[in-house]
Every structure is written in structure tokens, then in C-alpha cells.
């Protein structure tokens, strides 16, 4: 057989992204695009649109598990300040507010979205990450033989804690034995408690089990293992069929 080597050079396109996320995002983008973007734009689709006199690439995607859009600039061709001012003005009637990446991180964890190289990496299989439904074992693909031999059970779950916010790197113990660690954790305004992801060393039946969380300060807290996502398992929010019910 012959060998083939493919080399590709990936360049930074100098493109940066703004996200408009939340239940009013369709109305805001409809206004910003003069009606060209509306509720008929399917999820995970994209196209070029005129936003305030500038042509920009817009996708109906996001990193929040919310109804929303991402707007990609065209490098130095984009007048970023003008775009920012235009979008802020379009969002005013709908109460849109600026939020930093921390807010996005909270929402992506609440929504059960994994971060590459933080929650998942090349040392975990799709099955261990709970993403086995994306793998079609009836087809041939690179790595299939290795996956056939692997355990198909999940090692990555959600965790809730009423007395503390789980911190990345925190140890997870069951019966005084370390069985895993926290990959990411945040305070959840939706669930009114600390939440995060726990990665176990071995697959097992962990759902609804109480575990011990050892934070970096060595304090001990009780947590409960839960299935992901933490809420909206039917994805009604993404399909504009519902909104978050924040607990008071």
C-alpha cells in the first residue's frame, strides 16, 4: 500500500466573535438585520448578513445552551466599534446587557456543554464523556478498532453542591477513596447552588450518589452526582419553546 501525507497550514483569520444569547436574541437580530434574520433560521445554520451597513458572518449557535446567535467579524475590515454601538442600540428595547465570558461559562456549564481541553481531551473516549450517541459504530472510521475494545459506560457527569462551589481540580472521594476530580465548577443562579463536572477514573453507576468534594483549601463538602444537562433536557430553550425558570 502507498502512504499519503497531508500538510495543511492553519492561519489565524483575525476574526473574533460576539454572542447575542437569550430569549430576546431573535428579536434583537431581526432588528439588527432589517428582518433578514428571524425565527425561521434553523439551529446550526449560518450565512452572511448586513448588520448596520457591514457584511458579517452570523450563525445560529452559541456556547450557552440558550437561544442565540454568534457574529463573526471580518478581521481588520470590520469596524468593531461601530458594530458594537449598533448592536447595543438594537438591544436596548429588549433590555440587552453586556456580559463577560464568566457569565457565558456559567451558562455553558448549566447547559451541560463541555469545554475542550478542560472537561474533555484526547485521554477520554466519546463514550466516557457521555457522547457515545455521536459515534456510529456501524460505519468505518479512524479509531474504530480502539473504541470497540473500550468500555461504553460514562465517566463524566454533573455534580451539585449546596454548601460550596466545586473548584477545578477538587478531589472526589467515595468511602475515603479518591475516585475522580472536578474539571470545572461555577455558582448556578438558576439552581441556586454550586454545580460542576466530575470526571471519574472508572465507569460505574454514579447517578444520584452522594460523594465527598475536597476543595483546594482542604474543606470537605457533600455533593450529588447528576445526569447532564442540569436542566432543559428536552432542549426547548434552544428551539424557542421555553425560558429558564430561575429559583428564588
Would you name each region that the model predicts?
Residues 2-3, 7-248:
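Conserved, structured C-terminal
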